[in-house]
Amino acid sequence: MQKASIAILLAGCLAAAAQAGDITGKVTLESTPGSRKVGQTKGSAGYEKGDVPAPSESEVEDVVIYLEGEKLPSTPLTKMSGKNTILQKNKEFLPHVLPVTKGSKVYFRNQDPFPHHVYSVSQPGSFEIVKHGSTVRSQQFDGTGEVEIFCGIHTKMNAYIMVVDSDYFCSPSRAGVYRISGVPAGQYSLWLWHPRLPRPAKKSITVPASGSVNLDLKL
């Protein structure tokens, strides 16, 4: 009788695990980027305003797509600290946008032969790494939202860390194609963040118990 109960329990767990689908689609950016006025350099009056020029290539890979909803597992978020790295190379931050889960560490690795002054004054995670040389430095981000990063020495350097409270997130490929896999069946809020959006955009989506649902997105 006990073996039968265990078998029934295992069958129920397998059925629950199987009730998950994928979200797929394509993201299209319809607006044209322009330069932005942002806080950058640190002068005698503190962090001053300056221009960050418009990017010279496609920005679709800079979109961050993430899910929120009651059906998502309540287990602790995955911390992929080993993969959360921002390089400083040729006076650029690479990648330009890095999505991470709340509580993750981000590692800053300088590959230039000269130092950088990495900092952010964003509310979710302000920090400062002065005269960052070849030593790899890290910063943990416990708040959610957009963290905008600059270099106090090279004023055109700019990047973003988007901290999300969900394990279900992704960024599109260069062609704009995206996929979020293994989402438990149910209704969710799908959020889209991009550096040029004044605030994240929200879409409602229902994920099936199996298979996939397609949602193309335009920004």
Regions found by a protein language model. Name each.
Residues M1-A7:
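Bacterial N-terminal signal peptides that target proteins for export
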Residues A7-A15:
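Bacterial N-terminal signal peptides
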Residues Q19-L219:
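Extracytoplasmic copper-binding redox domains, predominantly the cupredoxin/blue-copper superfamily
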